[in-house]
């Protein structure tokens, strides 16, 4: 594959709140353990939109121009001198988090918790919404021929669902409540069913998203209106015939987390995936006296191989989640679409010569 010419690396860059621009960046120079990738498909995540709108997420503040994007797949064009398992032409999915050191968290297999981790499009680290991108080869996973680039890009949000279901110990025959029918809620629904959940209820404010949830496998849906958390929990129990053993909360909304506590079966598990306000009011006594375990989720770890196997074996289907596609040259328009909440997953196609999924 021919090496890219200088100046061909079109990139989508956030400069601060409300300020994103398409700019040409230099082609990255490789280290011995890196690969250079020609990017193909990059999904827009809610965090990308948040950095564009607000210039920060919590303590992560955009202080200098930063390339956006972290849900991605592409083709290897060049490898570093120590890379043995990949070669030019290989199609890969990118795990965006790469530990910079082997610390106590890496040693126990929970490298997602290491505080110094490199993570695409998290200040100050650049993302991969660009033509060409450099990444550590150990965190690039070869895609089988049966898995498309778009599916490869969707492994990132799919990994959140896998990790959340692992944290909740979803298993054969479980009844599961998923709060939120956005992209993360949808992949959590797919994974829960793939892991053997007998029945899954999905809640959301949006009727159209709940319709999509039914299409991809939800047994029941509840459109949340002005009901109290206790009333929503009662509806969940009525639909399932009993309280769910596992609740996975994907919105971050205070009332939804409260619903999760009230709804979950005694001795069950509430998994917190959505990130909302730093301080929230919760009925903790209600959780304590019924021994409802509350577990947090921060990104994911050790999920890419399982996700690839699930996609290759057709255990689950993420293709219906992609509702909009834009070429890289129209990335700003793509972000406007994502900001409006139109559709579900917006995908940007970075290779001008290949717009196929």
Swiss-Prot record:
Its cofactor is Zn(2+). Its main location: mitochondrion. Keywords: Acetylation, Cell projection, Cilium, Flagellum, Membrane, Metal-binding, Mitochondrion, NAD, Oxidoreductase, Phosphoprotein, Zinc. It comes from the Eukaryota. Optimum pH is 9.0 for sorbitol oxidation and 7.5 for D-fructose reduction. The keyword NAD applies. InterPro entries: ADH-like_C, ADH-like_N, ADH_Zn_CS, GroES-like_sf, NAD(P)-bd_dom_sf, PKS_ER, SDH-like. Substrate binds at residues 51, 156, 299-300. PROSITE patterns: ADH_ZINC. Zn(2+) binds at residues 45, 70-71. GO terms for cellular component: cytosol; extracellular exosome; mitochondrial membrane; mitochondrion; motile cilium. Inhibited in vitro by p-hydroxymercuribenzoate, EDTA, l,l0-phenanthroline and N-ethylmaleimide. Testis has the highest level of expression, followed by kidney, liver, and lung. Low levels of expression are also observed in lens, brain, and skeletal muscle. Expressed in sperm flagellum and very low expression in the sperm head. The keyword Nucleus does not apply. It is found in: Mitochondrion membrane; Cell projection, Cilium, Flagellum. SMART domains: PKS_ER. Homotetramer. Belongs to the zinc-containing alcohol dehydrogenase family. This is Sorbitol dehydrogenase. The lineage of its organism: Eukaryota, Metazoa, Chordata, Craniata, Vertebrata.
